[in-house]
Amino acid sequence: MSLPGLELSQTSSEREFVPAPPTQITLSKGSEWRFEVAFGTAIRVKLLAGTAELFGTELAASQTYTFSGTKAAIYTWHGCTLEVSAGDTISTIDGLGSGGLNGEGARGYGAGGCQSEYTAEETPMVEYANVHFALEAMRQEAKATGKDGPRVLILGPENAGKTSVAKILTAYATKVGRQPIVVNLDPAEGMLSVPGTLTATAFRTMMNVEEGWGSSPMSGPSAVPVKLPLVYFYPLQNPLEAEGAVYRPIVSRLALSVTGRMAEDEDTRETGIIVDTPGILSAGKPGSLEIINHIVTEFASSERLYSTMMKNYDNKPTSSASAAASDERITVVKLSKSGGCVDRDAAFMKSVRESQIRTYFFGNPIPSTASAALSMSASSTTNITLSPHAQQLDFDSLAVYNYTIASSDEDEDEYDPSQFGASDTFLPGGRNDAEGPETKHAEETSFTSSVPGLGGSSGDDAASGSSAVPLKKVLPPAPNTLANSLLAVTHTAPNASPAEIRDASIMGFLYVADVDSEKGKIRVLAPIGGRVPPRAIVWGKKWPGEVVGLVG
């Protein structure tokens, strides 16, 4: 009923979104369906007939999978029929979808609301499968002779599909019962962790179709077995920062941990390692080849990169500081770039990072009918909701460290009014009277890596050099720029040396929701309850940087 003259019965200009009817897509043998879904929107995909896989992981028949903020492809070896429909609107950190649009505005005109979708007949999947079979032959030989399995290093420019190839090779390996160790050396994206981390994970089970690599342990049920990543924090976007002086020692420490795992686990030793690298290392920038050489030494596409790799490494003996010398030879193989590789702009990558951080603290907001079916839940859909614990901490009680490396692409202003007292401006050189000789001595002392056997023969290795580790303790009062950023809690003591803090693995992450400089307190979110462990904490100021809107 409507009141005369008020026109209350008229429909609102913001009409409720009405999804289009489901669309059936038939794929012929050896073809794939490529699709892009914006953040804030979702599509549902169901396999009606035949067989299909997403980055090597098979889709279960008659199960509905939900995708959001994804650029992916579903491939079929023998032909299949897919049903694609529109999903619910997914809330993001800022309430907006990709490109500043809300859920409905970001929907495209493709099947199910995809921004882009099409079927491709020509794919490089046969090449990738041949690589898998070649690796399997090497693994069988390693098992028969007692040697280490193949160590695969994937190199290529940005947006070339390196991570997709790593997923495919990992999925195929687990499908035949292998247990590869996957190493992510790209701090731009997290693997089973937040951005700004270098991780290594032993994959014993299948990967999650909807979540990519899968999920790390959490206090709740999981349809797919969780993975246990070893995490190191590298709070810089570019591995070439400070000429790799921070990146290389962390890579060495990660390689040492991986080598130790392989020495104790026969299954992973026979299967080998798959290493995914940052695309910037293949851009030909100064220092890139030195870091690639360091990665090859520790762990083991353009024409110029391919030629350089062939010249420097093809059929050369392996030389690893963390592994025993052998007569193994390095083989360089060039793979075709998939036509489905698309550029990911800065806005999309920002949404990817925010989504990974939000998922770490609050769980996956995407409702999944496939997960509900696999977990035999009573509900038709399910999504993993986590409840982080909020608490206030005295900043004086924390040992927070920050990397003091000037950004290579911007002149960052380090000024923060809360860091200065009323009379600090008038002291010689801006020095604080509270800083005694001990503080000055600690800042000027050089620390070197104490890891035996790592980088001992490389003169340019920062771990063995005499230069100081660029880690500085953040002194009270708490800087206002600490708000909306991540803190990495390490496994080392709060008074450890900068080299030990740099080389320490990560226990977990805190999100700083608010800073009260006057009271000397900060409000943080923690993934678990209880007191924050008394450990050294590294501030992710430069990377992943500020994440606004995670909490209200």
Swiss-Prot record:
Region entry Disordered, spans: 409-471
Residues that, per the record, bind ATP: 32, 71, 159-164
Subcellular location as annotated: Nucleus
A GO term for molecular function: ATP binding
Compositionally skewed regions (Low complexity) per UniProt: 459-468
InterPro entries in the record: Clp1, Clp1/Grc3, Clp1_C, Clp1_C_sf, Clp1_N, Clp1_N_sf, CLP1_P, P-loop_NTPase
Positions with biased composition (Basic and acidic residues): 432-444
Major location category of this protein: nucleus
Entry keyword annotation includes Lipoprotein: no
The family this protein is said to belong to: Belongs to the Clp1 family. Clp1 subfamily.
Assembly behavior: Component of a pre-mRNA cleavage factor complex. Interacts directly with PCF11.
HAMAP family assigned to the protein according to its UniProt record, in alphabetical order: Clp1
UniProt function note: Required for endonucleolytic cleavage during polyadenylation-dependent pre-mRNA 3'-end formation.
Name the UniProt record assigns to this protein: mRNA cleavage and polyadenylation factor clp1
Record organism: Aspergillus fumigatus (strain ATCC MYA-4609 / CBS 101355 / FGSC A1100 / Af293) (Neosartorya fumigata)
Gene coding for it: clp1
